[in-house]
Structure formats: C-alpha cells, structure tokens
Amino acid sequence: MSLKQLGSLTLVALCLAACSSSGGGSSNNLNAPDTGNNNNANNKHADKSVPKLLKVSDLREDTEEDLERAFHSPVPVKLSSYAVKINGKTYTDGDIDYATLGNGLKRVDVVETASANINGQTHNVTRNSKLHLYQQPYSIVTFMQTTGGQVGSLGKIEKGEFKSSYFLGQATETLPSAGSFNYKGVAFNEKEQGKLDYTINFDTKKGAGSISGLNQTGKITLHESNITKIWDDGFEKYTHYGVEEGKATSEKQGNVTYDLGIFGPNADEVSGTVSQGNKDLAGFGGKKQ
C-alpha cells in the first residue's frame, strides 16, 4: 500500500516579528549578516534577522492529523512519541529556529519519527522530507517535499510534490510614499536556482518583474500588478503589503500567478511564490538595491 496522502508535509507558519510586536512572538533578535545593499542610512536594524521560530508541538499535531486523514481513522490519532531532525539536529519539544540555518538558499534534510496509535494498533512512523528555503534577514520563503518513509506494516510513504509552506517575515508597516525600488535576488524550484528582478513604483503602487534561469519553467514574466494590503489568515494571522495572485507568464507553462510580500522596516525585501492552479512552481526572494 502506497500512501500518497502523506506525500506532502505541511509546516505551520512561523511566528515572526510581525506578530511579536503584538506580544505573540519571541522577544529574541537573531544576528544575521548585513544585506550589503541597504541604501537607507536610517535603517539601523539591517544586520538583524527577525525571529523565525517553529513549534515542535505544532509539527506533532500536523503529523497526527495527516495520519488520521490517510487512514480514515474514526478516532483521533495520537502519538506516544515524536521527534524531528532538521539539518542533523533532533528536536522533541520547544522551538526550531530557522535563523540558525543562515541566509541564502538552503536545501535541508528533515526526518520525522513517531510512534502512533492508528485504529487500535501501534505503528512506528518515519517520514523523510527535503526543506527548500530562501532566507533573508527580514523574510523567508519555504517549500517542503516528502521524499519517502514508512508507516509500520501499513505501507510506504511515496515521494510528494514540491509544495509551498509559506512566505513570511517582518511585514513592512508603512510603504514608501514615492520612488521606485529595484529588488534583485534568487528564484528556485525543486532542483534549480535562478534569478529574480522586480521593481516597485511606490508612486503608482504597482510592481512588475521577471524570473530567469529556471529551465523547468523558462523565463517567467511577472506582469504589472497592484500593491495592496493583504490579510493572511494562516496560522499566524497578520497583514502585509504585496501582490495577491498577480498575473504572470511562463515561457514553457503558459499562464501562471504570483504572490509577493514586502518585508523589512523600509521595504527592504520581497519574497513570494509562483504557482499554476494548485501546483507550486517556484519561490523567490530579493533585496532592495
């Protein structure tokens, strides 16, 4: 029996500085390298990385829900034990701090192990995944792809799709009132790394750009879209400025859409994703030049 239902591990949203200002997040600031391209002399926090914390207890609950759905359990699935290993470090409780993985594009191994009571029987569960993330001091965009695993004698876990988990960060509270900013950075998919070039005109509150260097999609044109205030109703509910389902065109895959957020105290960064319907194609992030 193959378990396609478990082929996509969903990570809950991180509690970042956008929510810590209201008392919901960590009070600790994490040191991170300076972006090196910050032209705003008044930005005294460019060398600080916002907290990027993930609760192990939330991952444990997600695993219970995934198993319950996969096996149509009439009663809630409960884990008697749970551990997750990320980049070689094992966690059984507390928080996982993604900032320790460093800025830039990372592809990190994730292994979850658990003991689960499913329909009255105890099974040892192992799920292997690859975490793809692009991290900047003020933002992060992540994708998770299950690579395999086993649920006791019930069957194997198949390889899953390249799925977006989230893009979040310290949301820009007040947009610049005028001027155009160009953002350059990285775009990525399951195996490739490309480039992002995006420009926002804050006079007109519109943005447009392109992604290049990804053979799977070819060049992606991110068509001009309105910059608006967006309500995010995910795990950490908050608002941010950006683009919601903007129109885009892929050379190889036709019409696609993109979502983009603006992050940092001075609109320092952008991060986002490109998708086609329910299929996630790429993530991206860039900093102000």
Identify the residue ranges that each predicted region occupies:
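Bacterial Sec-dependent N-terminal signal peptides
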Residues: M1-G7
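Mature soluble binding/inhibitory domains
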Residues: S20-Q289
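C-terminal motif of bacterial Sec signal peptides marking the signal peptidase cleavage site
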Residues: C15-A18
